[in-house]
Amino acid sequence: MEAREVEEMRRSRLLTLGGIGYTAVIALAALVLVMGALGLVLKVAAAAGALPSEVAKVANALPGLKASVDANPAAGSLSSVSVST
């Protein structure tokens, strides 16, 4: 092989790896945004008076997600909402 062909192959591999890395970063950023939005929705639902067990049940029905809500419905307070994959 000529040096030029080797250089073209090397450049092609780097572009492919860069594209894969770029796609992975975008996918991770999208996942973070979705998780944040889901957490916000759960907080609003819990603050609106939904029972914590109902909110967690709906969130846990989504594939790949686990949610927990710590709240005191009698006092109308919301301690925390957490969502994880």
Swiss-Prot record:
Other remarks on record?
Answer: Ignicoccus hospitalis is unique in having an energized outer membrane while ATP synthesis occurs within the periplasmic space.
Instruction: Note the superkingdom of the native organism.
Output: Archaea
**Which subcellular locations apply to this protein?**
Cell outer membrane
Quaternary structure annotation from Swiss-Prot or TrEMBL: Forms extremely stable complexes with apparent masses of 150, 50, 45 and 38 kDa. Found in a ring-shaped complex of 7 nm diameter with a 2 nm channel through the middle. Complete denaturation requires temperatures over 110 degrees Celsius.
Q: Where is the signal peptide?
A: 1-18
Q: Does the keyword field hold Heme?
A: no
Organism expressing this protein natively: Ignicoccus hospitalis (strain KIN4/I / DSM 18386 / JCM 14125)
Q: What's the protein's topology in the membrane?
A: Single-pass membrane protein
| Keywords per UniProt | Cell outer membrane, Membrane, Signal, Transmembrane, Transmembrane helix
Q: Which GO terms describe its cellular component?
A: membrane
The identity of this protein, by name, is Major outer membrane protein 1
Q: What functional role does this protein have?
A: The most abundant protein of the outer membrane, it forms a pore through it.
Keyword Electron transport in annotation? no
Q: Where are its TM segments located?
A: 22-42
